[in-house]
């Protein structure tokens, strides 16, 4: 077999299919990277391992609670793993988060209810909204890019927060691309709080009170701390359940059978 040598390739005169296979196998390594791609790689933090069951904590400040007519004016996002550890900033200094204020004019802000006018005015949010230059579309794209930086795959990140079903209701209309990227389930810390109030009210009474600063960032930090408190003090850790073989082996009684049992007990007296 005779071979012809050329720079960067070897061609077989009688077996050209071998060269085709060789070219395909190495072409992925020989493609030049553009300067734009290199800059993008440098700006995006490299995750060597995927986040463990990531939670996408989001809190929105709105002009009211009418998801049809009111608007999201501030949004904040913190991403944690399933152990509630926040992702780190690109420079390694502190935790990473995304936060932005959307511009609306006086024609929108003056229509807020009294509660929003007072609290958003006192917190300085109203002034930030009027001064902001960012549109809703810009903020949606920025938030989606931020989430995809740490959670590139769709239907992986789970939306989390306090009464986060309300935030999601607004985001379905105003941040549809973000909602489409996230999993359909949510982790609503307020649901655990309502269960604790009924199941163990004495313990729930010792739950640290929220400061209610009503800024998106402070609300998320308090929500994460609140879920951590429940995990430390209310929910059973794995070491307390792994050794209990009977858990889940018995079928729970239906409400009707429980009621019948109580009636039988009462007739025995």
UniProtKB/Swiss-Prot annotation:
Question: To which species is this protein native?
Answer: Saccharomyces cerevisiae (strain ATCC 204508 / S288c) (Baker's yeast)
What the protein does comes down to:
3'-to-5' exoribonuclease specific for small oligoribonucleotides.
Any one biological process term the GO annotation gives: mitochondrial genome maintenance
Among the Pfam families in the record, one is: RNase_T
For this record, the Gene Ontology CC terms, alphabetical, are: mitochondrion
Q: Which family does it belong to?
A: Belongs to the oligoribonuclease family.
Q: Name one GO molecular function term.
A: 3'-5'-RNA exonuclease activity
**Chain residue ranges for the region called Disordered:** 240-269
Q: Where in the cell is it found?
A: Mitochondrion
Q: Which SUPFAM superfamilies match?
A: Ribonuclease H-like
Catalytic residues (positions)? 184
Q: Which SMART domains match?
A: EXOIII
Matching InterPro entries, A to Z?
A: Exonuclease_RNaseT/DNA_pol3 (IPR013520), Oligoribonuclease (IPR022894), RNaseH-like_sf (IPR012337), RNaseH_sf (IPR036397)
Task: Identify this protein by name.
Answer: Oligoribonuclease, mitochondrial
Name all Exonuclease domain ranges: 55-227
Task: Give me the stretches of Low complexity compositional bias.
Answer: 245-261
Miscellaneous note of the record: Present with 1730 molecules/cell in log phase SD medium.
């Amino acid at each position: 077999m005779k071979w012809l040598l050329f720079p960067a390739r070897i061609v077989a005169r009688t077996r050209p299919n071998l060269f085709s296979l060789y070219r395909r196998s190495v072409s992925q390594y020989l493609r030049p990277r553009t300067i734009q791609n290199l800059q993008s790689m440098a700006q995006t933090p490299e995750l060597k391992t995927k986040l463990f069951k990531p939670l996408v904590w989001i809190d929105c400040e709105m002009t009211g609670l009418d998801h049809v007519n009111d608007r999201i004016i501030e949004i904040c996002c913190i991403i944690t793993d399933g152990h509630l550890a926040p992702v780190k900033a690109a420079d390694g200094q502190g935790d990473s988060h995304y936060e932005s204020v959307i511009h609306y004019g006086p024609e929108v802000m003056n229509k807020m209810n009294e509660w929003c006018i007072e609290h958003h005015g006192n917190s300085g949010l109203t002034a930030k909204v009027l001064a902001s230059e960012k549109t809703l579309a810009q903020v949606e794209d920025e938030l989606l890019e931020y989430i995809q930086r740490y959670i590139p795959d769709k239907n992986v990140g789970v939306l989390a927060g306090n009464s986060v079903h309300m935030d999601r209701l607004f985001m379905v209309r105003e941040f549809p691309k973000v909602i489409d990227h996230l999993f359909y389930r949510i982790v609503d810390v307020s649901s655990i709080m309502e269960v604790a109030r009924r199941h163990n009210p004495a313990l729930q009474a010792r739950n640290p009170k929220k400061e209610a600063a009503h800024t998106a960032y402070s609300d998320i930090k308090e929500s994460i701390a609140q879920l951590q408190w429940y995990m430390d003090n209310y929910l059973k850790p794995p070491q307390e359940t792994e050794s209990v073989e009977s858990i889940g082996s018995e079928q729970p009684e239906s409400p009707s059978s429980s009621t019948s049992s109580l009636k039988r007990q009462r007739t025995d007296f």
